[in-house]
């Protein structure tokens, strides 16, 4: 999906659920306690694209949880992320949880992963259920989450691709 497509889908999803143009511009907290570690991963790259997309659509973005914000967007499933979502909800903030992980992705990923996959599923369900809106990158993962019994609103938004990295003149 090209960056412009991602921006339009993101903006439509955010407007549908949280846009506060009549009051003031929305401010989104892109939360990751271990941001520097996460940024080295595929999820971290998705976070960078999300930030660029939001800013490109005139949405103010912060990564500092001490700042005031309207919506917290969480991409990871660490305990600190779960507790941030709970804190935000308690303060009346909206929570967008990006569901990058499923039990099916976790299974067979390392020796012994199948033994703890049921616990992993319980944990991610607990995390994702804190979201007012759950974003997931594929229809397949959406169907898995629905199959888990998650009742929260789930929208599919493919992770963006920076098409400037694939210019014809760069393929020489």
For the regions a language model picked out, list residue spans one by one:
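Active-site proximal beta-strand in glycosyltransferases
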Residues: 71-73, 87-106, 135, 155
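Acidic anion/phosphate-binding donor-loop and adjacent secondary structure
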Residues: 146, 161-172
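Short N-terminal targeting/anchoring amphipathic segment
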Residues: 61-80, 96
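Acceptor-binding helix/loop patch of EC 2.4 sugar-transfer enzymes
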Residues: 33, 97-122, 148
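Short, well-ordered alpha-helical microsegments
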Residues: 80-83, 142
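Carbohydrate-associated surface elements
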Residues: 140, 157-160
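N-terminal subdomain of nucleotide-sugar transferases
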Residues: 1-66
